[in-house]
Amino acid sequence: MGLSDGEWQLVLNIWGKVEADIPSHGQEVLISLFKGHPETLEKFDKFKHLKSEDEMKASEELKKHGTTVLTALGGILKKKGQHEAELKPLAQSHATKHKIPVKYLELISDAIVHVLQKKHPGDFGADAQGAMKKALELFRNDMAAKYKELGFQG
């Protein structure tokens, strides 16, 4: 299920575009997630009160959290699958403290792909999309395995 060197290169090329403006990408990913799947908002105490897209766009806390999410994901993607050290604390907090089900990781993965398609249509063609989906699936599968080790049935 690993990615080829060429696939990792496609992932990292598009991720370079994300890193050029992580706050706006992170904000858009979370807004896309919350709009498409309002139930996910319930896992975020500090965002539960945000009901409209305008409120979400105006929230500095949401932008800050989006930055945190994509910065962590970028660190994992750059490891090209060798992300055990980065994944362990993330899985620990998401399983035991935040109780984020694997399904929600799938939903945010879809939101990431959606935002990249929207913001970078010329740089995120079918090959890059396929590679990114594969990289995000690898991340989710490894998170799920860690969840299992921790006894979390998310």
Swiss-Prot record:
InterPro entries: Globin, Globin-like_sf, Myoglobin
Transport found in the keyword field: yes
Major enzyme class: oxidoreductase
Gene Ontology molecular function terms on file: heme binding; metal ion binding; nitrite reductase activity; oxygen binding; oxygen carrier activity; peroxidase activity
Signal peptide: none
GO BP terms, alphabetized: removal of superoxide radicals
In-chain residues carrying the UniProt-annotated modification Phosphothreonine: T68
Binding site for nitrite: H65
The reaction(s) this protein catalyses: Fe(III)-heme b-[protein] + nitric oxide + H2O = Fe(II)-heme b-[protein] + nitrite + 2 H(+); H2O2 + AH2 = A + 2 H2O
Localization of this protein: Cytoplasm, Sarcoplasm
UniProt KW keywords: Cytoplasm, Heme, Iron, Metal-binding, Muscle protein, Oxidoreductase, Oxygen transport, Phosphoprotein, Transport
Positions contributing to O2 binding: H65
One matching Pfam family: Globin
EC number: 1.7.-.-, 1.11.1.-
The Globin domain, residue ranges: 2-148
Cellular component aspect of the GO annotation: extracellular exosome; sarcoplasm
Residues holding heme b: H94
Modified residues (Phosphoserine): S4
Principal localisation: cytoplasm
Source species, domain of life: Eukaryota
Subunit structure: Monomeric.
PANTHER family xref list: MYOGLOBIN
Further comment found in the protein's record: Marmoset, woolly monkey, and squirrel monkey have a minor myoglobin component that appears to differ from each major component in having Phe-Lys preceding position 1.
Role description: Monomeric heme protein which primary function is to store oxygen and facilitate its diffusion within muscle tissues. Reversibly binds oxygen through a pentacoordinated heme iron and enables its timely and efficient release as needed during periods of heightened demand. Depending on the oxidative conditions of tissues and cells, and in addition to its ability to bind oxygen, it also has a nitrite reductase activity whereby it regulates the production of bioactive nitric oxide.
Family statement: Belongs to the globin family.
The name this protein goes by in its record: Myoglobin
